[in-house]
């Protein structure tokens, strides 16, 4: 399938291509004291657990050595096979320079030094036809201005129950559904490009 260079698929890192949640939960468990409740979610962490998590994430090596997450790589391989232009879109913590450095090292090691990377505080500002991201707030922000955008979301405990008419959730069993959604987004992109081309010839603009 011939694909325009503008058919960009944006891929998140933490919880999408990297097993951020699994690794952090495992490392927090190692630091847990007897009698403390088990931590299973990162929402509403108690102060002591948040401080430990911050200490863990202060290491460049921690970010650089995060394990791959199979769900995200399944989607990546499908998008690559369809001819999407792959770009990494990840959030950069305000006060953690180690994360910025470690993420770039991870990208270089796992995806190569030539892949396009955007590290931002606001994913909603970044262009793409598709966003692959596990975090509902980031997905909603990106889709807010993109009535034709496609979201693909690797399923985890943090996004349980999330739904959106433009988002396909992937749990490891429905890769064919993900492929179809990605293919249909390319079909839509091509039809919109054709309409814009015809519109410009007739002197009006197609949105």
Regions found by a protein language model. Name each.
Residues 118-144:
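Conserved Lys-Pro-Asp/Glu-containing loop-to-beta segment of HAD-superfamily phosphomonoesterases
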Residues 85-87, 130, 150-152:
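A structural signal for isolated positions on well-ordered beta-strands in alpha/beta enzyme cores
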Residues 103-118, 164-192:
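Structural recognition of alpha->loop->beta junctions
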Residues 67, 72-102, 107:
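Substrate-recognition element of Asp-dependent hydrolases with the DxDx(T/V) motif
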Residues 187-207:
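C-terminal accessory extensions appended to soluble enzyme cores
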């Amino acid at each position: 399938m011939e694909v325009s260079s503008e058919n960009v698929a944006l891929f998140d890192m933490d919880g999408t291509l990297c097993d951020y949640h699994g690794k952090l939960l495992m490392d927090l468990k190692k630091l847990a004291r007897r009698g403390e409740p088990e931590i299973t979610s990162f929402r509403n962490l108690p102060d002591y657990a948040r401080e430990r998590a911050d200490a863990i994430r202060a290491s460049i090596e921690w970010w650089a050595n995060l394990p791959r997450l199979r769900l995200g790589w399944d989607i990546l391989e499908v998008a690559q096979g369809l001819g999407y232009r792959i770009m990494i879109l990840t959030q950069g913590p305000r006060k953690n320079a180690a994360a910025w450095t470690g993420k770039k090292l991870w990208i270089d090691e796992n995806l190569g030094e030539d892949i396009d990377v955007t590290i931002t505080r606001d994913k909603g500002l970044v262009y793409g036809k598709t966003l692959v991201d596990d975090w509902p707030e980031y997905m909603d922000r990106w889709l807010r201005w993109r009535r034709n955008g496609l979201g693909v979301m690797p399923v985890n405990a943090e996004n349980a129950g999330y739904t959106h008419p433009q988002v396909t959730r992937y749990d490891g069993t429905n890769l064919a559904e993900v492929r179809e959604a990605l293919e249909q987004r390319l079909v839509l992109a091509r039809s919109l490009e054709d309409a814009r081309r015809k519109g410009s010839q007739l002197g009006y603009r197609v949105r």
